[in-house]
Design a protein with these regions (language model features):
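Non-catalytic C-terminal accessory region of glycerolipid acyltransferases
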Residues: 1-14, 118-397, 404-414
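Negatively charged sequence features
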Residues: 12-23
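Short, conserved catalytic or adaptor-binding loops enriched in Gly and charged residues
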Residues: 22-27, 72-74, 100-103, 215-216
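Helix-to-loop junction immediately C-terminal to a conserved catalytic motif
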Residues: 23-53
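Short alpha-helical segments and helix-capping/turn motifs at coil-helix boundaries
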Residues: 31-33, 111-114, 151
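A broad, low-specificity signal marking well-ordered, structured residues that form hydrophobic/aromatic
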Residues: 32, 46, 80-81, 126, ...
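Hydrophobic pocket-lining residues within nucleotide cofactor-binding pockets
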Residues: 40, 53, 88, 169, ...
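Catalytic core of membrane glycerolipid acyltransferases/transacylases, capturing the structured
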Residues: 42-116, 121-122, 132-147
Length: 414
């Protein structure tokens, strides 16, 4: 049993991961742009509501989370807590390259109504995707078409009197361009493999070559922060006077009004920022800057880059290049045809930090994080003092990006 005050967020790991692995990928591969960050309050509680997209692994959520935190200087108290679907933790292949408890160590909390409520009551800034899985798995043919919004964030925003700040995610639809989903196949994947959907055709390639399950094309994502939405006022307009009572019908109408409002603004921002989703000239220029570590930046090198950073934190330095290569021999499974069984087998037979041999089933389960986390049973500790800052970081907030040179004239804003 995990004691009260369970906090899986690992800031030391995240800062090391950012410096050694992810910030170089952000800068030279994804090259994200953050517009309007000054509209986000420095303290919570608040809900940052973003559209979901990509028809792939949730790269849009990871890039947005990392971009926001870097903008805030990697300060502990400014780290958003992401509400994510529990399926991301229950099976190892839904964590990036099987990294133990990755989503929770990165600040995520299992998505359910009670957890969401407790996070806002705690004063957290919560990153939330109101479309859920249908948003990310809608297929390229429905790109930028917002799916039905959940009513949870409407109810809780009214109950806790917190602002909802929209974020419009542009170009993440091009993480897997021309990808599609089939309903019957998705239901089969959910039932057999606990995978919410299988994107086609890349998903079929990922069945053969495991590293392609985590593939992302170099979409230059742009995150545009919109003006706060006064959800409590919208709820009152629907005649709801007691937000403690869950009124699904009226809250659903408010959620639909918010969806339509965000859809109109999203369409506008796509016209401004979405004309060059990859911007290949910028990509080539950035990759040339890191040509000596080219493979570490590209998706084909991510299995090695991500996994070695994790393992190096709990093992002595390699005795040489050959030793460094041989001790991670199991990573070849990501590149072998049908390498999934080899990866699963080595996780069972190798000792930590490579696998779980020698650990009890309960110990391995806690390390992996493949359980449903309910804050009612395992609560977060109180938030630290807002004045405490992260020590030792040299990262400074990024300047707002200039508009693209080819920017079209923006329509008048209401």
């Amino acid at each position: 049993m995990i004691p009260q005050g369970y906090e899986p967020l690992d800031l030391d790991y995240l800062r090391d991961f950012a410096a050694r692995v992810y910030l170089p990928i952000l800068d030279h591969y994804f090259r994200p742009r953050l517009v309007g960050a000054e509209k986000i309050p420095a303290e919570g509680p608040l809900i940052l509501a973003a559209n979901h997209s990509g028809n792939a692994f949730p790269h849009d959520a990871v890039v947005l989370d990392a971009t926001l935190w870097r903008h805030d200087g990697l300060v502990a108290e400014r780290k958003f807590r992401t509400a994510y679907e529990k399926e991301l933790t229950l099976v190892w292949w839904m964590r990036p390259f099987g990294l133990d408890n990755f989503w929770r160590r990165g600040g995520g909390v299992d998505m359910c109504f009670d957890n969401f409520d407790r996070q806002l009551a705690r004063g957290d800034r919560v990153l939330y995707f109101p479309e859920g899985v249908p948003g990310i798995g809608k297929g390229f043919n429905r790109r930028y078409r917002l799916q039905r919004f959940s009513t949870s964030f409407v109810t809780l925003a009214a109950r806790r009197q917190v602002p909802v700040i929209p974020v419009y995610v542009i170009n993440a639809e091009w993480v897997h361009p021309f990808g599609y989903c089939l309903g019957p196949l998705n239901r089969l994947m959910q039932r057999v493999f606990t995978v919410p959907f299988l994107p086609l055709p890349v998903g079929l390639l990922a069945v053969v070559f495991p590293w392609m399950w985590y593939l992302s094309f170099p979409a230059q994502m742009t995150f545009v922060v919109g003006d706060p939405i006064d959800v409590p006022a919208m709820v009152r307009e629907e005649g709801v006077t007691d937000a403690a009572v869950r009124d699904g019908e009226r809250m659903g109408r408010v959620a639909e009004r918010i969806r339509l409002r965000m859809q109109a603004r999203l369409d506008e921002e796509v016209r401004i920022w979405g004309r060059r989703p990859w911007d290949l000239r910028s990509l080539v220029r950035e990759l040339w800057k890191v040509r000596r570590r080219f493979l570490a930046i590209l998706p084909i090198g991510w299995p090695v880059t991500f996994t070695r950073q994790e393992r190096d934190r709990s093992r002595p330095p390699a005795r040489g290049r050959l030793h460094a290569l041989l001790r991670d021999w199991d990573l070849v499974g990501f590149y072998l045809p049908f390498g999934w069984p080899l990866l699963s087998l080595t996780r069972a037979l190798r000792r930590p930090p490579y696998g779980y041999r020698g650990l009890s089933r309960a110990e391995a389960r806690e390390i992996r994080g493949d359980f449903v986390w309910r804050l009612a049973e395992r609560p977060l500790p109180p938030r630290p003092a807002a004045a405490e800052e992260a020590a030792g970081t040299e990262i400074v907030p990024a300047a707002p990006p200039p508009p693209p040179a080819w920017r079209v004239r923006a329509p008048a804003r209401p």
